[in-house]
Amino acid sequence: MSNGIVAKRYAVALFKIAKEKHVLEMFEEELRLVQNVYVKNGELHSFLTQPNISKEQKKTFLANVFGSVSESILNTLYILIDNKRIDILPEIADEYVVLANEERNVADATVYSTRLLSEEEKLNIAEAFAKRTGKDAIRVKNVVDEDLLGGIKVRIGNRIYDGSLQGKLARIQRELMKNR
């Protein structure tokens, strides 16, 4: 079974627990925290995937590092250790965020721009794209892309809205080539 399918199953289980306990937001924050530490800390990843370190040592280590997270998240980490699936932790977190966003009718957007956007600009973009996508809210993450000449690109899910200068020039070029 592919890692994506397995990750989705874990995410769905966590989502059901979170929904039952009314802690969707808290679980999301905790999963993002755990995911961030796991992805950015190569030593942690190496330790948790080392076959010569016992499962109990790994669990004790996880309890020390992530002792502040909820019992459900910590138990999920333990199960991942037991099933030798800790490597799919980032995918589980991503899948959980998708499920939680769907439940709240929220979307995450990555906005690529030539400079950091002000809070007001982010708010304006969020409002405009919330209307356009039919979502209640859009959470904006701004990424500076120095390759852009001007304008912005917005990525929501697997959809890209290209309002960049390069995008406009490419559309003009296609139109000119079509009219030849």
Curated annotation (Swiss-Prot):
Keywords (A to Z) from UniProt: ATP synthesis, Cell membrane, CF(1), Hydrogen ion transport, Ion transport, Membrane, Transport
Membrane topology annotation: Peripheral membrane protein
Molecular function, one GO term: proton-transporting ATP synthase activity, rotational mechanism
GO cellular component: plasma membrane; proton-transporting ATP synthase complex
Subcellular location: Cell membrane
Gene Ontology BP term (one): proton motive force-driven ATP synthesis
InterPro entries tied to this protein: ATP_synth_OSCP/delta_N_sf (IPR026015), ATPase_OSCP/d_CS (IPR020781), ATPase_OSCP/dsu (IPR000711)
Major place of residence: membrane
Function: F(1)F(0) ATP synthase produces ATP from ADP in the presence of a proton or sodium gradient. F-type ATPases consist of two structural domains, F(1) containing the extramembraneous catalytic core and F(0) containing the membrane proton channel, linked together by a central stalk and a peripheral stalk. During catalysis, ATP synthesis in the catalytic domain of F(1) is coupled via a rotary mechanism of the central stalk subunits to proton translocation.
NCBIfam families in the record: ATP_synt_delta, PRK05758.2-2, PRK05758.2-4
Subunit structure of this chain's protein: F-type ATPases have 2 components, F(1) - the catalytic core - and F(0) - the membrane proton channel. F(1) has five subunits: alpha(3), beta(3), gamma(1), delta(1), epsilon(1). F(0) has three main subunits: a(1), b(2) and c(10-14). The alpha and beta chains form an alternating ring which encloses part of the gamma chain. F(1) is attached to F(0) by a central stalk formed by the gamma and epsilon chains, while a peripheral stalk is formed by the delta and b chains.
Similarity remark: Belongs to the ATPase delta chain family.
Protein name (Swiss-Prot/TrEMBL): ATP synthase subunit delta
Species of the source: Bacillus cereus (strain ATCC 14579 / DSM 31 / CCUG 7414 / JCM 2152 / NBRC 15305 / NCIMB 9373 / NCTC 2599 / NRRL B-3711)
Taxonomy of the source species: Bacteria, Bacillati, Bacillota, Bacilli, Bacillales
